[in-house]
Amino acid sequence: MAEISILGAGGLTGKELLLLFSRQKEHEVVHITSDKLAGKTISEVFPEVSFPKNLVFKKHEDIVPLKSLVVLAVPNEVSVESAPKFLDAGHKVIDLSGVYRLHNQEILEKYYKLKHTRFNYINRAVFGIPEIFRDQLKNADFVSNPGCFSTSVILPIFLLGQLRKNLRPRIIVDSKSGVSGAGGRTEDSGYSYTSVYENFRAYKILSHQHEPEIREYVYSKSGLSDPEVIFTPHLLPVYRGILSTIVLEFDSEPEQDLISILENSSLNEPFIRILKTPEEVELKKVQHTNFLDISLRKRENTLVVVSALDNLVKGAAGQALQNINLMTGAKETLGLLP
């Protein structure tokens, strides 16, 4: 059993983490923090979350996690300093922010709009997509949990296997997200449900922080020479879920059955589902699950891949629990499958 401390447990991802941990018995949540909710109990804040112990929210600086694994679900600027502090104290750390994902400091600081004072810790972090980095995650003490959009793009491309070598270095991604995947906790941010009801729009065009993340990890796993990524996120009038449409081009038309390639690549992956047609991929099938659904269609040398996931589960808290299971030697599906 692993003891878990969750910093930032009062946010959207923090709540999802609490729900997931409440459904299993091998990991024990021992500390939860939220500066805004300090002094309140879980049952007061989230009555739908049931734990044997009615934990009390504390302020970040008031906890001493002892031997626990620390999950950081806090703002980017807080993670910059918190991750090294807990690592230096001997804790395993999973960071759900984006500040330890990119290996180019200039690009990281540009997209995250901050000065990264602990960049020397970047190479210590394992990028937390289990289907790609499973062996490294089993021995990791520091995991940088991937972005939700990034997961929906990097993983489908990775599953193309050797065909990735024939891709042209230009990737066009059109992603639609519910408000919880786009900063939906601030009422006046333009990302609240009342702002998007009966509405639909693009945001952060050519400036979203997941664009360089997609570029870096598609490059590192595919061998594409610094691929150009054109990523456009859109805001849907729904609460949760991401659907991504990825347009790829091959140097020449592949003759293989691409659905079969995806099926073979994901044969032993418990959270990857390959659907026969891209029209079958939809949000309702993945909401409240850790599944990533994928399908595709080819016309000559053009390939359109469609993927869907729940941004709060496979795109955040669920993938974090999957990583925790690997880091602690637990069954990978613990708390994520019935």
From Swiss-Prot:
Catalyzed chemical reaction(s): N-acetyl-L-glutamate 5-semialdehyde + phosphate + NADP(+) = N-acetyl-L-glutamyl 5-phosphate + NADPH + H(+)
List of catalytic residues: C148
Domain of life: Bacteria
GO molecular function: N-acetyl-gamma-glutamyl-phosphate reductase activity; NAD binding; NADP+ binding
InterPro entries: AGPR_AS, AGPR_type-1, NAD(P)-bd_dom_sf, NAGSA_dehydrogenase, Semialdehyde_DH_NAD-bd
Subcellular locations according to the entry: Cytoplasm
Pathway: Amino-acid biosynthesis; L-arginine biosynthesis; N(2)-acetyl-L-ornithine from L-glutamate: step 3/4
Main location: cytoplasm
GO cellular component, one term: cytoplasm
Swiss-Prot/TrEMBL keywords: Amino-acid biosynthesis, Arginine biosynthesis, Cytoplasm, NADP, Oxidoreductase
E.C. designation(s): 1.2.1.38
Family, as annotated: Belongs to the NAGSA dehydrogenase family. Type 1 subfamily.
Function recorded in the entry: Catalyzes the NADPH-dependent reduction of N-acetyl-5-glutamyl phosphate to yield N-acetyl-L-glutamate 5-semialdehyde.
Classification via NCBIfam families: argC (TIGR01850)
Designated name of the protein: N-acetyl-gamma-glutamyl-phosphate reductase
Organism: Leptospira interrogans serogroup Icterohaemorrhagiae serovar Lai (strain 56601)
